[in-house]
Swiss-Prot record:
A GO term for molecular function: RNA binding
Complex and partners: Homodimer.
Alphabetic keyword roster: Isomerase, tRNA processing
Coiled coil regions in record: none
Amino acids binding substrate: Y111
Single Gene Ontology BP annotation: tRNA pseudouridine synthesis
Reactions listed under catalytic activity: uridine(38/39/40) in tRNA = pseudouridine(38/39/40) in tRNA
Protein name as catalogued: tRNA pseudouridine synthase A
Annotated catalytic residues: D52 (nucleophile)
Species whose genome carries this gene: Ehrlichia chaffeensis (strain ATCC CRL-10679 / Arkansas)
Membrane-traversing stretches: none
Signal peptide: none
Job description of the protein: Formation of pseudouridine at positions 38, 39 and 40 in the anticodon stem and loop of transfer RNAs.
């Protein structure tokens, strides 16, 4: 039986989603151990988006297989019990057919990046948003996103060690919602290059600091060189929001 799960987690204290040889503090390994404890079955959990260390999730989706057919609420409650005290929660469980794959069946992935633009330090949002002290030019940032949306070669917007063979991606939606000190950047695509969202955010912030003009985004894309874009924004402001199937 295949189970589809929706997961929420605070990524602050984890090394990221993916299991690592020399650490037991990945979200994947902790989740697989929780499933083992209640089901007595070893299983692999496949995820829609492998988040990096420090990145959070509001609606991450994954799947795993068990030989037993259990009520979904039993699976949810049992996993959550064995996840204590980790900052990981199973929000929902669905039964699905074997054709469903959390990663390969995904049609669109949605991310949110949170910025707090103020001089005072963060308390409630500490490790959950990027604090930028100097006032940002929001209008410049909004103008810049128009050059990022759509289908482009995003070689300038990916990590130097990115293993993807094809740097061409389509950004379906990119918008900024600004409310007083809060700047929320929403971005959606079928898939992303490694660090692509965080580099886009870092580049938009350079526009907000008036270091880049909005039109300079065209030069960055044309260069196809990571050094032309802005910094990689910190992981703790990034949230995996949801997946469309």
């Amino acid at each position: 039986m295949r189970y589809k799960i929706t997961i929420e987690y605070n990524g602050s204290n984890f090394i990221g989603w993916q299991k690592q040889k020399h650490s037991s503090n990945s979200i994947q390994e902790i989740l697989e151990n929780a499933i083992l404890k209640f089901s007595q079955q070893h299983t692999t959990v496949y995820v829609a988006g492998r988040t990096d260390a420090g990145v959070h999730a509001l609606g991450q989706v994954a799947h795993f297989d068990l030989t037993t057919n259990l009520d979904t609420y039993v699976v949810r409650n049992a996993i959550n019990y064995h996840l204590i005290p980790h900052a990981i929660a199973i929000l929902s469980v669905e039964k699905t057919d074997d054709k469903f794959h959390a990663r390969f069946s995904a049609k669109k992935r949605h991310y949110l990046y949170k910025i707090i633009n103020r001089y005072s330090p963060l308390t409630i949002d500490y490790n959950r948003a990027w604090l930028i002290h100097n006032p940002l030019n929001i209008e410049n940032m909004i103008q810049a996103i128009e050059y990022i949306k759509g289908n482009h070669d995003f070689s300038s917007f990916r990590a130097r060690h990115c293993q993807s063979k094809n740097p061409i991606k389509t950004i379906d939606d990119l918008k900024i919602i600004h409310n007083n000190q809060s700047i929320n950047i929403h971005i959606s695509a079928i898939s992303f290059l490694h660090h692509q969202v965080r580099i886009i955010v870092g580049t938009l912030v350079e526009c907000g600091k008036n270091n880049f003009s909005p039109e300079h985004i065209k030069n960055i894309l044309k260069a196809k060189n990571r050094s032309y874009a802005g910094m990689t924004a910190p992981p703790y402001g990034l949230y995996f929001v949801k997946v469309d199937y």
